[in-house]
A protein has these predicted regions:
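A short, polar/proline- and glycine-enriched secondary-structure boundary/capping micro-motif
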Residues: 124-129, 153-164
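An acidic site on a long C-lobe helix of protein kinase domains
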Residues: 1, 16, 66, 99, ...
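C-terminal helical cap and adjacent loop that interface with cofactors, partners, or active-site loops
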Residues: 70, 143-147, 160-225
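Predominantly a Rossmann-like dinucleotide-binding segment in NAD(P)-dependent oxidoreductases
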Residues: 1-93, 216
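Contiguous beta-strand/loop segments that form the cofactor/metal-binding neighborhood of enzyme cores
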Residues: 65, 69-149, 176-189, 222-225
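Short aromatic-enriched loop/helix-cap "lid" or pocket-rim segments at secondary-structure transitions
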Residues: 2-5, 29-36, 97-99, 127-128, ...
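Active-site donor-binding loop signature of nucleotide-sugar glycosyltransferases
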Residues: 22-24, 117, 165, 223
Length: 225
């Protein structure tokens, strides 16, 4: 599903980004509050709890554990550097790391955006992840919703595309990333779908968010474009 959306945007993009909103919610309340595992986690290889909940190891909570995936998706589809960030982070249930995030971004090209992350209750939506990316550019807009298996594109010339996707098209394949890495190493893929540049954009966006939450003010990137 994501690759189909990426290929559509490569064929016809939405122009200069003006606004982007990213929303994610997953069942991490127990995990990040030291009260239980992540649903669907392997029972054979259980990581130490502090892998997730000791900030010295994890660097944070929901942002590091989950929003890294959301940002990776967003910047894969619409690459853009973050110039400024302002973030609120919440740690209910006496959690040692944050369970919820509300972040505002200003991108290097002047566009603005929001990133929202929430630790859902176990059992909600049958533990199905929620992840949505919406972007508006000067030549069109798109909405990618993995939870509802929806991919919609609209362009100023009147073109409208509503992709037909099978059930569970947005489901996570736990082995896909590892298999893709092996394929890249073997030369079996024409392109690396997770290049270093994508990782750098994601890390920079998260780093600024955590800086802002810690300082209580806008964090500004010191890296020149």
């Amino acid at each position: 599903m994501v690759q189909q959306a990426y290929e559509q945007l490569q064929r016809k993009g939405i122009g200069e980004l003006e606004q982007m909103s990213i929303q994610m919610a997953t069942q991490t309340r127990e995990l990040l509050a030291n009260l239980g595992p992540y649903p669907g986690a392997s029972t054979e290889q259980v990581p130490e709890q502090e892998t997730w909940t000791n900030p010295k190891n994890s660097g944070g909570g929901y942002g590091q554990a989950q929003l890294s995936h959301a940002l990776g998706l967003a910047f894969r589809l619409q690459p853009q550097r973050v110039a400024e960030a302002f973030a609120f982070m919440s740690s209910p249930r006496n959690a040692p790391v944050e369970l919820h995030d509300a972040i505002s971004y200003k991108f290097a090209n002047g566009a603005i955006g929001t990133l929202s992350g929430g630790s859902s209750h176990m059992g909600a939506w049958q533990n199905k992840d929620e992840l949505q990316v919406r972007a508006i550019g000067d030549q069109g807009q798109f909405l990618i919703d993995l939870h509802r298996e929806s991919a919609y594109f609209w362009y100023v010339d009147g073109t409208e595309i509503n992709m037909k996707l099978p059930p569970n098209a947005g489901a996570v394949d736990n082995f896909a990333a590892a298999n893709a890495l092996v394929d890249v190493a073997l030369g079996n893929l024409q392109a690396n779908r997770a290049p270093g540049e994508l990782g750098a954009l994601t890390v920079e966006a998260l780093e600024l968010a955590y800086q802002s939450a810690s300082l209580g003010k806008i964090a500004i990137s010191k890296v020149k474009n």
